[in-house]
């Protein structure tokens, strides 16, 4: 394509500087260094690295990256060669191979365009859609949309609801036990007063013993509250700190994942554009001027992928630790709860068993339960008050009649 031109096409570097260098890589057992190559004759004036594969000599060395231009292999220039020819040159070398390159000094912020931001929004929307809805709207779903970590996030939300329910139930239970302990304390005070005022020594001792039993139960209840209360603190720590921190980490991971998917989609679109122009036989400006825009997106995609991999690793580790803590913590808390409740009920049973003082014999007044013929019926204070009021009314009526005199046959009053 460029052979017909009488001049060289100037590269459009988009203001991105390059730094020359070289690196010697030791090939692996498959005679590979772990890079894929793009560009080259006849459509692009330069060859560049499209991708550096994981766990390969090039990736482990870390010198070259996606978007870097390859200028030579073992001191031999590759200008004007195709990517297939350059790949064969690298394969022909056994053992170590020296790659000459121009390092692309790209700033990832340059690749974060409005198009990438819109693609991130699209991926975020598609993430929460079903496959049928996405297909109906004509939205493509990336392969990482059905991410297992998203399901782990849903499980985390269910765990948070479980802990929230346990916390509320424990609070209500502790409140009920506190009120119950106050009731036992009131019982103890009442029976203690009765025992102190009881003149019969045996009955007094029985009432005091029964009062002490209720006061002991109140102490057992307070001890139960002090033992179970730290359980609320541990549950709240897990619910209000560990789970929100993990949830925030997963949200950061999703943001990085959507950014990586956006760059992948952008690379796919640019590849399709390039293939379409090649099929039509029309030169593409960015390709014929060094394809720097494409190489910038390749670099951004590689760095986004590195962040995505690291973030995914961190999230998986944090989720694993959180799951282990959940299993261990829930078992420990339930064991502490059950053992504390068991001890409380056993202690209460032992105290009440020792305080078996019934029936209690008490001395009542001799007239209280006397039903003989010489004894009148039992009257309480209200009946006595009513009798006194009736007697007073009769006295007043008698005095009134004596003062006014008798009545005549017609019922009218007459003077005496």
From Swiss-Prot:
Residues 22-105 form the PDZ domain. Residues 391-401 have a biased composition (Basic and acidic residues). Residues 373-416 are annotated as: Disordered. The keyword Acyltransferase does not apply. Zn(2+) binds at residues 44, 46. It is found in: Cytoplasm, Perinuclear region; Membrane; Postsynaptic density; Synapse, Synaptosome. Ubiquitous. Residues 144-357 form the AH domain. Changing residue 44 to G: Decreased lipid membrane binding, but no effect on peptide ligand recognition. Pfam families: Arfaptin, PDZ. InterPro entries: AH/BAR_dom_sf (IPR027267), AH_dom (IPR010504), Arfaptin_fam (IPR030798), PDZ (IPR001478), PDZ_sf (IPR036034), PICK1_BAR (IPR037959). The keyword Electron transport does not apply. A lipid is attached at residue 414 (S-palmitoyl cysteine). The modification Phosphothreonine is found at residue 82. Gene3D superfamilies: 2.30.42.10, Arfaptin homology (AH) domain/BAR domain. GO terms for cellular component: cytoplasm; cytoskeleton; dendrite; dendritic spine; glutamatergic synapse; Golgi apparatus; mitochondrion; neuron projection. The AH domain mediates binding to F-actin. The unoccupied PDZ domain is probably involved in allosteric modulation by forming an intramolecular bridge with the AH domain leading to a 'closed' formation. Binding of a PDZ ligand, such as GRIA2, allows enhanced interactions with F-actin and the Arp2/3 complex thus enhanced inhibition of actin polymerization. Monomer and homodimer. Interacts with CXADR. Interacts presynaptically with the glutamate receptors GRIA2, GRIA3, GRIK3, isoform 3 of GRIA4, isoform A of GRM4, GRM7 and GRM8; with NAPA and NAPB; and with BTG2. The interaction with NAPA and NAPB disrupts the interaction with GRIA2, conducting to the internalization of GRIA2. This is PRKCA-binding protein. It comes from Rattus norvegicus.
């Amino acid at each position: 394509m460029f052979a017909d031109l009488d001049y060289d096409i100037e590269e459009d570097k988009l203001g991105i500087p390059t730094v020359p260098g070289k690196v010697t890589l030791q090939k692996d057992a498959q005679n590979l260094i772990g890079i894929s190559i793009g560009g080259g004759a006849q459509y692009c004036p330069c060859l560049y690295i499209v991708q550096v594969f994981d766990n390969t000599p090039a990736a482990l060395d870390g010198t070259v990256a996606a978007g870097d231009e390859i200028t030579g292999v073992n001191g031999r220039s590759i200008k004007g060669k195709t990517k297939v020819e350059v790949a064969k040159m690298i394969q022909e070398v056994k053992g170590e191979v020296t790659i000459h390159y121009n390092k692309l000094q790209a700033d990832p912020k340059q690749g974060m365009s409005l198009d990438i931001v819109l693609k991130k929004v699209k991926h975020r929307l598609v993430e929460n859609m079903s496959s049928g809805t996405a297909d109906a709207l004509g939205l493509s779903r990336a392969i990482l949309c059905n991410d297992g970590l998203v399901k782990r996030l849903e499980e985390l939300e269910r765990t948070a609801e479980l802990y929230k329910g346990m916390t509320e139930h424990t609070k209500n239970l502790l409140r009920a036990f506190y009120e119950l302990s106050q009731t036992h304390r009131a019982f103890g005070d009442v029976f203690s007063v009765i025992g102190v005022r009881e003149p019969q020594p045996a009955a007094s001792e029985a009432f005091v013993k029964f009062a002490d039993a209720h006061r002991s139960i109140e102490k057992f209840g307070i001890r139960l509250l002090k033992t179970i209360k730290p359980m609320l603190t541990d549950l709240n720590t897990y619910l209000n700190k560990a789970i929100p921190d993990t949830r925030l980490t997963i949200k950061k991971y999703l943001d990085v994942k959507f950014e990586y998917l956006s760059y992948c989609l952008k690379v796919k679109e640019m590849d399709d554009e390039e293939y379409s122009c090649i099929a039509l036989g029309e030169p593409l400006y960015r390709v014929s001027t060094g394809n720097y825009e494409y190489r910038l997106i390749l670099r951004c995609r590689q760095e986004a992928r590195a962040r995505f991999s690291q973030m995914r690793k961190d999230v998986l580790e944090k989720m694993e630790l959180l799951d282990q803590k959940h299993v261990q913590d829930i078992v420990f808390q339930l064991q502490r709860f059950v053992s504390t409740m068991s001890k409380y009920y056993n202690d209460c049973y032992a105290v009440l068993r020792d305080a078996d003082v019934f029936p209690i014999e008490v001395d009542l007044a001799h007239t209280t339960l006397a039903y003989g013929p010489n004894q009148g019926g039992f009257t309480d204070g209200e009946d006595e008050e009513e009798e006194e009021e009736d007697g007073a009314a009769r006295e007043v009526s008698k005095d009134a009649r004596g003062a006014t005199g008798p009545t005549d046959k017609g019922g009218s009053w007459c003077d005496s």
